[in-house]
Amino acid sequence: MSGDFRVTLLGTGVPIPSPERFGPCTLVEAGDQELLIDAGRGATIRLYQLHVPISRIDLQLLTHYHSDHTSCLPDIWLTGWLESHFGTRKTPYKVIGPTGAKRLMENLERAYADDIKIRVADEKLPLSGIATDVTEYDRDGPVYEKNGVKVIAFEVDHGDVIKPCYGYRIEYGGRVAVFSSDTRYNHNVIKYGKGADLLVHEVAMARPELMKEAYIQRIIGHHTTPYDCGRIFTQTKPKLAAFTHVVQLASIAVPPPTLHELVAEVRQTYDGPLEVGEDLMSFEIGDAVTVKRLMSHS
């Protein structure tokens, strides 16, 4: 078994399309396993850039069912089945998520039933590779354990009606990576994030002049401000804190806050190691957490 523990941000963006920040998705490589957290827009393209065949994905974890976190799910599931150097999955697509995962995958199977039928008849693809193996959960606790990799789900607070929504703590080789998912300031993130080697957290910010707008207040109210992220990082004390799902709100008249402004607000409450995540940024987790920027459009 390999001792490698690596986290790569495949997509660090939001529902609004961006060529620089694809939809939320994170690749976790732990020993001999490859796990995906969420499946936002463009995840398959980022996997291709990393030379990671979709058929190598051992487990798809879902945090919640907002479309920006699931829109690439059918692409990963279907394209990973096709006969190619990038696919050729012959075993069921394994999915773990909070209540709703089974309904989501059953509906995808119905939506693509004609395509599946045609490809089986025309390309002789195995039905075993398009089958799904879905596990749901509805409370905090371990949801997966195999070959030294342990995944613990914990509920977070993405808003009063945006439920269920969960984060993940992944343990391997005595190391820990924690992923907040979409959430407001939440004590469960602090509980499960304490002492993590890497804590990957969402963040949202708008300029003060935009905060008077009701829809902006509503969006910010579903996420964590840089100031509150700093409070969380100060209490959890990770070796490295990193942002993903970077929400920089704007309007026609008001530009988005800059990343410099975002970091400046974090520094009001946190003075430790910090990275503002970028697509294809990776973190090698060992005695220290090493950051690599891998963005490439080749």
Question: Would you name each region that the model predicts?
Answer:
Residues 1-177, 256, 261-290:
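Binuclear metal-dependent hydrolase catalytic cores
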Residues 292-298:
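A polyampholytic, Gly/Pro-enriched intrinsically disordered region
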Residues 167, 174-176, 184-281:
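Cap/insert and terminal regions of metallo-dependent hydrolase folds
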Residues 156, 205-206, 295:
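Short glycine-rich anion-binding loops that position phosphate/pyrophosphate groups of nucleotides
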